[in-house]
Each structure stands twice: as C-alpha cells, then as structure tokens.
Design a protein with these regions (language model features):
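Glycine-rich, charge-decorated loop segments at or immediately adjacent to ligand/cofactor-binding or catalytic sites
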Residues: 20-27, 114-123
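Glycine-rich oxoanion-binding loops at beta->alpha junctions
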Residues: 39-77
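Active-site/ligand-binding-proximal alpha/beta "capping" segment
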Residues: 65-100, 107
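Short, hinge-like loop/turn segments at secondary-structure boundaries
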Residues: 30-33, 53-57, 120-126
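Glycine-rich beta-alpha loop segments
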Residues: 1-35
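Short, acidic/small-residue loops that bind anionic groups at enzyme active sites
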Residues: 40, 80, 94-120, 133-135
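A charged, well-structured terminal subsegment
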Residues: 72-77, 127-155
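Short glycine-rich anion-binding loops that position phosphate/pyrophosphate groups of nucleotides
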Residues: 18, 42-44, 82-86
C-alpha cells in the first residue's frame, strides 16, 4: 500500500510508529519518495516506538488531539486491517462525516475479506434503523491497493 501511495504521488498521514503494519506502509511510502507525516501522542513514546525517519513527526498531548490533527492533515482516510485503535479512528472519522464536520472519503481496504464482518454489521445497523441508509455510503470499500488509491484520488 505504501508503494502504491508513493507511486500515485500522494503523501501519508498516520500514527507515527515504526512498528506493525502501518510502520511497514510508512517505510514503503518513504522508499517511494512520498511525504510521510506521523502524529503521535507524547504519552505513547515509551509504548509505540516512534518512527525516526519520517518527513515529519508531530508529538501531540493526547489521543483525541491525534485524531483531530490527522483529520486536519488528511484529504482522505484509508483504513487498513487493524484492531481496536483502527476501529476507533475509523468510527470517529465516519461519525464526524455523518455530522457534517468534514466531507473527506473513508475507504476500507478489504483485503482478503478482512472487513466483511464490519460491512455486514453496517448493513444490519441500516436495516434495524440505527444508521440512515444515506450514511451507509460514508464507508466505501476497496478490494485492492490500486483501487484504494484511485478512490483516495477521487477517480
């Protein structure tokens, strides 16, 4: 994904760690010449090993400020497979879009069907009346890195 982002001439805004899936994405984006900005809460510098090779690393006071800053810096949100932190960020971004606080796309990279369960839940939430049908479209889906980058670019 990082190579595809760089090849498209895009930059990357992410959490700022050098470990895990996003650390690998950041490394690939950097290797391809992309600008990569990390936003890391200062309290996590002892837990998440900050990436020292980024174009820019911003230390912020809290997780809340981190998410707000990432929303401010990003033009779109591409959600890769992940756990609770990924879910937290994705749900907040979609909620803010639902409230009209931004109009930036949120795209799930559904590699190997990773997000199928979440997508089924969203459909159930619409059927049950907890999510408006028009808001279901706030979460877009890409099956490949190429498709995800095209969607980020609005194509």
């Amino acid at each position: 994904m990082g190579a595809a982002i760089a090849a498209a001439g895009l930059g990357l805004v992410y959490g700022g760690a050098r470990v895990g899936l996003m650390g690998a994405v950041a490394d690939a984006a950097l290797a391809g010449g992309a600008e990569v900005i990390g936003v890391l809460p200062a309290v996590l510098t002892g837990r998440e090993v900050e990436h020292t090779g980024l174009t820019k690393l911003e230390l912020v006071p809290s997780m809340h400020v981190r998410k707000a800053r990432q929303v401010e810096l990003a033009d779109a949100f591409l959600v890769l497979p992940g756990g609770y932190g990924t879910m937290d960020e994705m749900v907040e971004v979609v909620t803010w879009a639902q409230l009209g606080l931004h109009t930036k796309p949120c795209i799930l990279f559904n590699t190997a069907g990773y997000w199928d369960g979440l997508l089924a839940f969203l459909d159930t939430a619409v059927e049950a009346g907890f999510v408006k049908a028009k808001n279901r479209g706030l979460v877009q889906v890409a099956a490949s890195a190429k498709e995800a980058v095209r969607m980020v670019m609005g194509r």
